[in-house]
């Protein structure tokens, strides 16, 4: 991949949606868990309409349970893992089979663990990484805040679910615009991002 600095443009034919470890055992421990899953489910609905590839992982499912049903991913393959990073050999092999892949759109939990490990591994491989901040969370808002800041320092793009979907569409004339518009017409649920702005500025250089 080119070493030139990228500006982070997204394209539906060059992007993959990653959904990380949204499992039953995390339901009571992750802050804003229902809201995070709701936003991730919106991302998944849109990805299906846009025919984007989707990678879903489960961390040690025998201990942490299956992916929660409200994500709407029952019909999709789950990649099991024990590593924090989603970039297992099996997932990496799947990515290599996707032509012209440039960007990964990343959602899930926990921000300071599996999300950050995945983002750093993907960046190291030369991919553009777009972290959907309103679809990522942790047990602690402090960990969430500093993990988002850390990923940005390393070159990931911090964004929102609606921002990603509109960029993927690119034009109101897109043949799937009206279908995706229905998904984003109702604002995404509050996942606690505004409370993070009392801490370190995520956008400082």
Swiss-Prot record:
It comes from Xenopus laevis (African clawed frog). Transmembrane segments: none annotated. Pfam families: Isochorismatase. InterPro entries: Isochorismatase-like_dom (IPR000868), Isochorismatase-like_sf (IPR036380), Isochorismatase_domain (IPR050993). The lineage of its organism: Eukaryota, Metazoa, Chordata, Craniata, Vertebrata. Belongs to the isochorismatase family. This is Isochorismatase domain-containing protein 2. GO terms for cellular component: cytoplasm.
